[in-house]
């Protein structure tokens, strides 16, 4: 989901 895209790092 786009909302969890920042959790990639």
Swiss-Prot record:
KW Ligase (keyword) present: no
Record's signal peptide: none
The entry's keywords: Amidation, Neuropeptide, Secreted
Gene Ontology process terms (BP): neuropeptide signaling pathway
Subcellular location: Secreted
Phenylalanine amide PTM sites in chain numbering: 9
Tissue localization of expression: In larvae, expressed in the CNS and thoracic perisymapthetic organs (tPSO) but not in the ring gland or abdominal perisymapthetic organs (aPSO) (at protein level). In adults, expressed in brain and thoracic-abdominal ganglion but not in corpora cardiaca and corpora allata (at protein level).
Predominant cellular place of this UniProt entry's protein: secreted
A GO CC annotation given for this chain: extracellular region
Protein family membership: Belongs to the FARP (FMRFamide related peptide) family.
Described function: FMRFamides and FMRFamide-like peptides are neuropeptides.
Name of protein: FMRFamide-like neuropeptide TPGQDFMRF-amide
